[in-house]
């Protein structure tokens, strides 16, 4: 009885292992074209559409609609520790993206810079991908 259970468990484990081995592997291959950008793809915005009703309920007339989406585009700034040692964030594993204050926009990153180090190895590269 125990032998039959062990045989069934081993067979199930081998089937699961074979299906996992046959599944496509997620490798960083091929996507060298840079970030893909789509701006305002079917998006709509409405500003200044607030209303207050009743006595003594004023609107913010000077800034009405401008506080809906405040946006301050600030570049990366080097920060000095006690004004002695400048510290800078250098992206090694990822690419820089400088899309700030882009309303209704999407920027899809490409594969990271160091993800293509092993690209030319035949075991890890695009075997039969048809570049």
Curated annotation (Swiss-Prot):
This is Rodlin protein RdlA. The gene is rdlA. One of its GO terms (cellular component) is extracellular region. Coiled coil: none annotated. It comes from Streptomyces coelicolor (strain ATCC BAA-471 / A3(2) / M145). Induction: During aerial hyphae formation. Expression is activated by ECF sigma factor BldN. The N-terminus of RdlA is more highly charged than the same region in RdlB; replacing 3 charged residues by polar residues confers the ability to form amyloid rods to RdlA and allows the mutant protein to form rodlets by itself, which neither RdlA or RdlB can do alone. InterPro entries: RdlA/B-like. Probably forms part of the rodlet layer on the spore surface; despite their high similarity both RdlA and RdlB are required for rodlet formation. Plays a role in cell adhesion to polystyrene plates. Does not form amyloid fibrils in vitro, unlike RdlB. Residues 1-28 form the signal peptide. Its main location: secreted. The keyword Secreted applies. It is found in: Secreted, Cell wall; Spore wall. Keywords: Cell adhesion, Cell wall, Secreted, Signal. One of its GO terms (biological process) is cell adhesion. Belongs to the rodlin family. Disruption phenotype: A single rdlA mutant does not form the rodlet layer on spore cell walls; disruption can be complemented by rdlA from S.tendae or S.griseus but not by any rdlB. Decreased levels of rdlB mRNA. A double rdlA-rdlB deletion shows no effect on spore germination, growth rates, differentiation of aerial hyphae into spores or surface hydrophobicity on a number of media, but spore surface rodlets are missing and cells adhere less strongly to a polysytrene surface. In the double rdlA-rdlB mutant chaplin proteins are still correctly localized to the cell wall of aerial hyphae.
